[in-house]
UniProtKB/Swiss-Prot annotation:
The keyword DNA-binding applies. A zinc finger (unnamed) spans 499-512. SUPFAM superfamilies: Viral ssDNA binding protein. Residues 1174-1196 have a biased composition (Basic and acidic residues). One of its GO terms (biological process) is DNA replication. The gene is DBP. This is Major DNA-binding protein. Homooligomers. Forms double-helical filaments necessary for the formation of replication compartments within the host nucleus. Interacts with the origin-binding protein. Interacts with the helicase primase complex; this interaction stimulates primer synthesis activity of the helicase-primase complex. Interacts with the DNA polymerase. Interacts with the alkaline exonuclease; this interaction increases its nuclease processivity. Keywords: DNA replication, DNA-binding, Host nucleus, Metal-binding, Zinc, Zinc-finger.
């Protein structure tokens, strides 16, 4: 595998401070939008908000900056001073430390600060405790307001800070340059801006964290320098401690949170530091091995139990240290994407009032709730993978043999309360007597304390987490019982509730109640095996290789070495371009809408009779056949492309950016992205630990400091080797930019000086840019060199990929979606006796069972039946896609892929397919769904919730999440969505003798099944991704170019559909009513579409629901619903006095020599406008086409 050479790009950035304190009067307009986008707990005056141009920062805000981080002595005598600058970018979040109470809280949940403090103590993490001396020198928000002439009761103060120096602010290593304050305009209002600089400016050649910032007599302070007052604001420091440092401490398993802050700040100031940054006295979580697993102490063989546990703990801290260093490198990166500008958000188009704009933002955030829920409830989510386990050496006889997979991340949420041990494995003081929960088989309930830990014990982030969870459902759509919140709250007044956070009047919004409502979806940690990581990321390129055959015949494979062709010429002959031409032609015919692949175009006005159906199907077939023939001719004749080998090497692929401004404008979504990145960094570092340990005396006290640089270099060497794409930048100061900084002698209230000289300390910078995720198109067997375990795994997969040898129901075949939607136009007489409503399920079931009376069929009907059966059987013979088309777009793309597979002689196994589960939003489908937002609690809860639903337009946040699936991913990915998916990173060496470690980011699964997302299906041939589109909402729209199997209502209903039969609709309705009971009436058309993936049946379900309510005089009655269903079933079961029946199975078998489509006898263009001839064409040719040999021009 060859990688692209690294290229250095010179980029110019302006010099500037490490941050600003913005001070403004509370805006009269836009405050509701800011509150919706922010994270704030109701019991706190602080908040975290997104960095948004036009909302929190001014237009023209420069995101990339060369930060003034210190000073250096220069000149012969060392008497002159120059400034030291480091590139960085501004954090995508801003931190409100005064006036946060003017923002509506993200949730009504009470006492979240108390919950976070209790959780922090329970899991052993340190609390924020300022030093007594610091409190004497606090710079309060009120004092700043007084200095700037603002009313403290109406002011809003927040910190905008560069990514690498947030921790420096939290440990008081910065000061406010009051003399450099200026004014900017945000949203038409004047805003004060005070620059923030590091104290290291006054300590030349001091590139470390200042342990005692308030010591004005520090020996490193330059001669005659006027040392400023360090910036210490207690609410801000606590906010940064909780929302910035806390999540990193949880991810890196470091109970001493302050030590993480100091380590990160030190890495920002000292660009040359490569040793250990985390403290030497770090502790580790003790946990028992899972049942049936060799105890960790014995895994290294030879009875060296202590050594085995020691290496596991050493790998844990060294991988965490390497991840922190890697995050520090990324924090110094310079990105191309500018911060999002609220005035350019497409979702505001046509929204003329403030209320309409707030509603649009509320609806969009509810979309993201589905992704947040998946990250919380998936057991392999990066949020839960907080511990390191040891699988033992790859070769028990040779402990030095390196293994990339010896150390790996495992879920640690449920064992976080276990005792803490030191590096030797001894329990540390304060944790004696604590019970030790096992990794697998524990009985811990997922509680509010666990949720607080996922948020780093930040009340603000926890409040925003609850904002999203309140918009998730408890998997009603898959048939689970959801708690009745009204009854629970009413009953709790007479019973003991195990919660000391709420009262009877606030219980409906309490975190405990929200988790109780979602109890069926709670993560269940039933495995500690090495597996995929559930990650949250963002697609920031509209290009992806997510077509049915992925990157088959891609530009890079067709490009000639001599470079004699233009890129446009090459691109026209790729598989991707061929699919674009097919879709464009079908869009011209008005069959599809490329921007919405699930849409049916204008087919409702086109298919008005059976002849129109013939025309549509034939046109689709001919368009595809023509493009495939031309594509294969160009590949073979023009380029000598090894088309069969190319199929074996084809992958579905996409890239997830590490650019922080590409994420959604929400602090919690940014947290999910950060935690995902930290998990990926640790996974890479853990793969190199065994190689670093091999042959070394790991017990030595100095081992970490000595070998941490080795591990760091190994991780850095993994860049650009297949998975983690990196970019090398040469950073220079902007042309003509003057370096302005505070005077070192005149004091912090003096104006800035622009006579400084300075240079960039990190001139050439290499940093990760994106993660490459891919999935092989073909099912690949184990290689000859694979291990026995790998061969066994592949053998277990073969049955899942094996194409079954059975005839598929016509309605579940390629034309099923057309036959169901347009049955009345195609077969107007295809209705049960005594019914006036044409019914496709009854018609095709009776037809295929040879039970349909022949007198009901005209000659035109028989010709159409022959045409449909011929197409369905021929398609089935060459089909290797384990999905039936749901629309014309899918029909065309699947047919095209199958034709290419036929040319390549593919056989036996289904290919891998992709499905996007697209997050959407809607108003609350029931009063219960709005319970958490009710202004009234206690006895008035139901009335309050009903009043909210009745006036729902007045509540911009009153939206809930929903999902829809789509099997054509390229248009979905072109919307540059936020995504959640499983990611498994393979590592391997290159060619023999090459010590470069290559990686592959494999598209894997989220564990937890329906807990993670109600529409996830256990199917090894399909890869799923949850997607929340950004283009068209918060950025410009782009132009088109294994968990355990769980039975659910979703699968039960699809099983009924796959079995077929005349009474499918009634059977589906009965199964739903028996499962959901009265909740069936709450299902809307979107829910039925998500459950059934069938538009016709979804409309039938809505009609049956309406009839059931009508039968019950407007009230839901299960008996009435079942009665309606049985009447519908009886109607379609009637065949009357059939007399002679039409023999569907034998009809047309007199011609055994018909040619399947795609062969030499395929109809020409003239066929599109005429009916198919009844005699002479075999509509029942069921045999697969003969295998082709080498492709020849005659075949083409």
């Amino acid at each position: 595998m060859e990688t692209k050479p690294k290229t250095a790009t010179t980029i110019k950035v302006p010099p500037g401070p490490l941050g600003y304190v913005y001070a403004r009067a509370c805006p009269s307009e836009g405050i509701e939008l800011l509150a919706l986008l922010s994270a704030r707990s109701g019991d706190s005056d602080v908040a975290v908000a997104p960095l948004v141009v036009g909302l929190t920062v001014e237009s023209g805000f420069e995101a990339n900056v060369a930060v003034v981080v210190g000073s250096r002595t220069t000149g012969l005598g060392g008497t002159a001073v120059s400034l030291k600058l480091t590139p960085s970018h501004y954090s995508s979040s801003v931190y409100v430390f005064h006036g946060g109470r003017h923002l509506d809280p993200s949730t009504q949940a009470p006492n979240l600060t108390r919950l976070c403090e209790r959780a922090r103590r329970h899991f052993g993490f340190s609390d924020y405790t300022p030093r007594p001396g610091d409190l004497k020198h606090e710079t309060t928000g009120e004092a700043l307001c007084e200095r700037l002439g603002l009313d403290p009761d109406r002011a809003l103060l927040y910190l905008v800070v560069t990514e690498g120096f947030k921790e420096a602010v939290s440990i008081n290593n910065t000061f406010l340059h009051l003399g450099g304050s200026d004014k900017v305009t945000i949203g038409g209002a004047e805003v004060h801006r005070i620059p923030v600089y590091p104290l290291q400016l006054f300590m030349p050649d001091f590139s470390r964290v200042i342990a005692e910032p308030f010591n004005a007599n520090h020996r490193s302070i330059g001669e005659k320098f006027t040392y400023p007052l360090p910036f210490f604001n207690r609410p801000l420091n606590r906010l940064l401690f909780e929302a910035v440092v806390g999540p990193a401490a949880v991810a890196l398993r470091c109970r001493n949170v302050d030590a993480v802050a100091r380590a990160a700040a030190h890495l920002a100031f000292d660009e040359n530091h490569e040793g250990a940054a985390l403290p030497a006295d770090i502790t580790f979580t003790a946990f028992e091995a899972s049942q049936g697993k060799t105890p960790r102490g014995e895994r290294d063989g030879g009875g060296k139990g202590a050594a085995g546990g020691f290496e596991q703990r050493l790998a844990s801290v060294m991988a965490g240290d390497a991840a922190l260093a890697l995050e520090s490198i990324v924090s110094m990166a310079v990105f191309d994407e500018p911060p999002t500008d609220i005035s350019a958000w497409p979702l505001f188009e046509g929204q003329d009032t403030a209320a309409a704009r707030a509603n649009a933002v509320g609806a969009y955030l509810a979309r993201a709730a589905g992704l947040v829920g998946a990250m919380v409830f998936s057991t392999n989510s990066a949020l839960h993978l907080t511990e390191v386990d040891d699988a033992g050496p790859a070769d028990p006889k040779d402990h030095s043999k390196p293994s990339f997979y010896r150390f790996f991340l495992v879920p640690g949420t449920h064992v976080a309360a276990n005792p803490q041990v030191d590096r030797e494995g001894h329990v540390v003081p304060g944790f004696e007597g604590r019970p030790t929960a096992p990794l697998v088989g524990g009985t811990q309930e997922f509680a509010g304390e666990h949720l607080a830990m996922l948020c780093g014990f930040s009340p603000a982030l926890l409040a925003k987490m609850l904002f999203y969870l309140e918009r998730c459902d408890g998997a009603v759509i898959v048939g689970r019982q959801e708690m009745d919140v009204f009854r629970y709250v009413a009953d709790s007044n007479q019973t003991d509730v195990p919660c000391n956070l709420c009262t009877f009047d606030t219980r409906h919004a309490c975190v405990h109640t929200t988790l109780m409502r979602l109890r069926a979806r709670h993560p269940k940690f039933a495995s500690a095996a090495r597996g995929a990581i559930g990650v949250f990321g963002t697609m920031n390129s509209m290009y992806s290789d997510c077509d049915v055959l992925g990157n088959y015949a891609a530009f890079s494979a067709l490009k000639r070495a001599d470079g004699s062709e233009t890129a446009r010429t090459i691109m026209q002959e790729t598989y991707r371009a061929a699919t674009e031409r097919v879709m464009a032609e079908l869009e011209t015919l008005q069959y599809v809408d490329q921007a919405v692949p699930t849409a049916m175009g204008r087919l409702e006005t086109i298919i008005t009779n059976r002849e129109a159906l013939h025309t549509v199907v034939n046109n689709v077939r001919q368009v595809v056949d023509r493009e495939v023939e031309q594509l294969m001719r160009n590949l073979v004749e023009g380029r000598n492309f090894k088309f069969r080998d190319g199929l074996g090497e084809a992958n579905h692929a996409m890239s997830l950016t590490l650019d922080p401004y590409a994420c959604g404008p929400c602090p919690l979504l940014q947290l999910l992205g950060r935690r995902s990145n930290l998990a990926v960094y640790q996974d890479l570092a853990l793969s190199q630990c065994h190689g670093v340990f091999a042959g070394q005396s790991v017990e030595g006290r100095n081992f970490r400091n000595q070998f941490q640089p080795v591990l760091r270099r190994r991780v850095m060497d993994m860049f650009n080797n297949g998975f983690l794409s990196a970019k090398t930048l040469t950073v220079a100061l902007s042309e003509g930019a003057a370096i302005c900084a505070p005077s070192l002698t005149a004091g912090q209230t003096a104006p800035a000086e622009s006579s400084f000289e300075g240079d960039v300390a990190r001139v050439t910078l290499g940093f990760p840019k994106e993660l490459r995720v891919k999935s092989r198109v073909l099912f690949a067997g184990a290689s000859a060199n694979a291990s026995e375990a790998a061969k066994a795994r592949v053998a277990s997969l073969q049955s899942a990929y094996q194409k079954p040898d059975k005839r598929v129901d016509i309605l579940l075949g390629p034309l099923g979606f057309l036959l169901k939607q347009f049955h009345a136009a195609i077969f107007p007489n295809g209705k049960p006796p005594g019914s006036n409503q044409p019914n496709p399920q009854w018609f095709w079931t009776a037809l295929q069972r040879n039970q349909l009376p022949a007198r009901l069929l005209s000659r035109e009907d028989i010709e159409t039946i022959a045409f449909i059966k011929k197409f369905s059987l021929d398609y089935g013979a060459i089909n290797f896609i384990n999905l039936a088309p749901n629309n014309v777009s899918e029909l065309a793309m699947y047919y095209m892929a199958n034709q290419i597979l036929r040319y390549c002689d593919h056989s036996t196994y289904f290919i891998n397919t992709l499905t996007a589960i697209i997050a959407g939003s809607r108003r609350p489908p029931s009063v219960q769904a709005a319970a958490a937002w009710s202004a009234q609690g206690g006895a008035g809860l139901e009335a309050g919730a009903r009043a909210l639903v009745d006036a729902v337009d007045a509540h911009p946040g009153a939206w809930t999440s929903m999902f829809a699936s789509c099997n054509l991913l390229r248009p979905v990915m072109a919307a540059r969505p936020m995504v959640v998916l499983g990611l498994s990173i393979s590592k391997y060496y290159g060619m023999a003798g090459n010590d470069r470690v290559f990686q592959a980011g494999n598209w894997a699964s989220l564990m937890g099944g329906k807990n993670a997302c109600p529409l996830l299906i256990f199917d090894r041939t399909r890869k799923f991704v949850l997607a929340c589109p950004r283009a068209g909402f918060v950025c410009a729209a782009s132009s088109l170019g294994g968990g355990a199997h769980e039975s659910s209502l979703c699968e039960q209903l699809r099983g009924i559909i796959s079995e077929g039969g005349a009474a499918v609709a009634s059977s589906v309705f009965v199964a739903t009513v028996k499962s959901l009971g009265p909740r069936t009436q709450q299902l809307q058309i979107e829910d039925w579409l998500a459950l059934l993936e069938d538009e016709y049946l979804s409309e039938e379900m809505m009609e049956l629901t309406a009839r059931a309510l009508e039968r019950g005089n407007g009230e839901w009655s299960t008996d009435a619903a079942l009665e309606v269903a049985h009447e519908a079933e009886a109607l379609v079961s009637q065949l009357g006095n059939a007399g002679e029946v039409f023999n569907f199975g034998d009809f047309g078998c007199e011609d055994d020599n018909a040619t399947p489509f795609g062969g030499p006898g395929a109809p020409g263009p003239a066929f599109a406008g005429r009916k198919r001839a009844f005699h002479g064409d075999d509509p029942f040719g069921e045999g697969p086409p003969d295998k082709k040999g080498d492709l020849t021009l005659d075949m083409l």
